[in-house]
Amino acid sequence: MITSKVKAAILGESTLKSAEINVETFKGIVQLSGFISSQTAANKAVELARAVKGVTSVKNDMRIK
């Protein structure tokens, strides 16, 4: 449930629509991986994930391409 909410938040952000971000969740910990266009975009994705109810922490494994 948290995974789909995080994905929806990321897809709803116009600056991240084309990003290739994978979302995995385990016990409230969200792991973001994949490729992103800039550090600013990565920070935005982490910020959006943290804002989702039920998320206790976010691990950023995204790579800038």
Region spans (language model):
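N-terminal targeting leaders
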Residues: M1-K65
